[in-house]
Curated annotation (Swiss-Prot):
Cellular component terms (Gene Ontology): cytoplasm
Record's protein name: GTP cyclohydrolase 1
Gene3D superfamilies hit by this protein: 1.10.286.10, 3.30.1130.10
Highest taxon of the lineage: Bacteria
GO molecular function: GTP binding; GTP cyclohydrolase I activity; zinc ion binding
PANTHER family: GTP CYCLOHYDROLASE 1, GTP CYCLOHYDROLASE I
Catalytic activity: GTP + H2O = 7,8-dihydroneopterin 3'-triphosphate + formate + H(+)
Amino acid sequence: MSSLSKEAVMVHEALLARGLETPLRGALLDRDTRKQRIAEHMTEIMNLLSLDLGDDSLAETPTRIAKMYVDEIFSGLDYANFPKITIIENKMKVDEMVTVRDITLTSTCEHHFVMIDGKATVAYIPKDGVIGLSKLNRIVQFFSQRPQVQERLTQQILVALQTLLGTNNVAVSIDAVHYCVKARGIRDATSATTTTSLGGLFKSSQNTRQEFLRAVRHHN
């Protein structure tokens, strides 16, 4: 972890301490080795499915999937990709809720490796520092780019922001469609799942909680 940013290490350690880190076996192999090994295994899977890898349309599929896994949809497994975060001194003494709604996210169900497609609402009440609004989006995206369950994703975003901002007053809500439900199994095309994680005043103060939940309902 020595080559990682201070913020990445802080967040990783906070998640480990709370039992909320994504289950990993150990240190990641280097990026190129991961891509090579994934492509080899995907080739074998496609062969087992009797797909003709000699066909022009399929020949590069194992390599494409390997690149997609490592560089894109599972890039959040590598804390080297954690967004650069700068916490700005709260010189204006802002003490009201800051809310960002409709943060789009795509993730991957860790049970079936199919898509989770949703939106997040994130809010916090500043203490000593504030964070650039786009960084909230980037943190949501970082933790989305992993095999996930929605409940853990919601809590990971919460703890990351609490750790970076130095305050418990953070709230996160995610509303998402799970393609493991929509495209297979029950094949329910209309249901959505909502998860909410509240900290500090968002949990202890009914008025603060209701203000946040009104913001969540605003986009529904």
